[in-house]
Structures are given as structure tokens and as C-alpha cells.
């Protein structure tokens, strides 16, 4: 399902992200412009189109976000002193293992707000892009994706393995590392704060339409 960069109502213009509807039932509306005093009507019309396209949930963002949104995408940064005892074995994703990595990612991210569902078309971009399987003592403990100085994804398949995955990824680089996390993902935020990451900004606020 294709996104709509410019969706027009009688009240304004918005961008509709529909690509996640077939997989997560979620659509996103980014308000570009709106006639003053008609934000609610503009959002409602956009959300109605998204639901007609199959969305179960619709989130919107724009300039006039309420003080209490549903969730906030936060930026966090940290410069972890890597503990060698927590650095495990890394295995880069290959053409033969990309599907397995993608399925693990989608399974572990299923209940994480605003996490993208990866499709078969996404597998090519995982190759040579910093996506890894992390093993400890010969067994898989999780997956990670380090893109330059940015952690794109962390998912553990063994309880309590998140810290080891972060240490292992950060052993590949030096300096500050950044990541993005939804404010509703309290478990992940606790892990990152325990490892020394701090919130440095807000990327986007999402309200439920």
C-alpha cells in the first residue's frame, strides 16, 4: 500500500503513511497545513480515509499537538564504556539469513508502539548495513542494527540479553551513539538509562486520531 504525500481536505493538507496497514493495521497522518480553528475536522477526515483503507489505529502529528499526546518519539544519546565481559559474537546478516533476521525483528517488535514492520523488500537494505545476529556461548541471544552512530534496532530473544546486545554493538564504534525510542516503551528506556543514555530531544509527538 502506497503512502500519499499530499492528501487534501477542505481544511488543509496532510501526508498519509499507509504502508504499515497490511502488517500492523496502523496509519500515520502528518498535518502539513490547516485552516485555523479546523484542526479536529481536518484530522478526522484524514483518519476516516485511513480507516477506509483498512487502518485499525490512526495516529497524527503536526504543529498544534496537545500537551498530553499518546506517545513521544525521543532521541537518546550515550557514550557507553564497553565492558569486554558483555561483548558477544557478531554475525552479519547475509542473503541466506536476512529473512530470519527480519522475522525475529517483526516478532519482537509486534507490540512496540510505532515500530516498523519489515517486509521482504526491506531485506536487501539489511545487507552490509550493520544488521547482526548476536550469539553467546553458541546460542542466539538477539539481533541488533547499528547504522553508523545510530542504533536502529535491538531485539533480544533471551530474557535479560538487552544489555549484552547494546555492549556488543557499541564495541564496533567509538564516541556517542544515538537511538530513538517511543515514550511508551518503558522497558527499553529503563535499559538505556541504566547503560548511561540520556534523553536529548523529541523527534515527534503522536496523538491517537
Specify the residue positions occupied by each region the protein language model found.
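Short amphipathic alpha-helix that is part of the acyltransferase structural core
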Residues: 1, 84-116
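Active-site rim helix/loop that mediates acceptor-substrate recognition in acyltransferases
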Residues: 1-8, 111-137
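Acyl-donor-binding surface of acyltransferase catalytic domains
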Residues: 31-89, 203-207
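Conserved acetyl-CoA-binding loop-helix of GNAT-fold acetyltransferases
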Residues: 36-48, 158-173, 189-194
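Conserved active-site tyrosine of GNAT-family acetyltransferases
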Residues: 65-68, 192, 197
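Short glycine/proline-centered loop/turn elements that form peptide/ligand docking sites
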Residues: 162-163, 185-188, 206-208
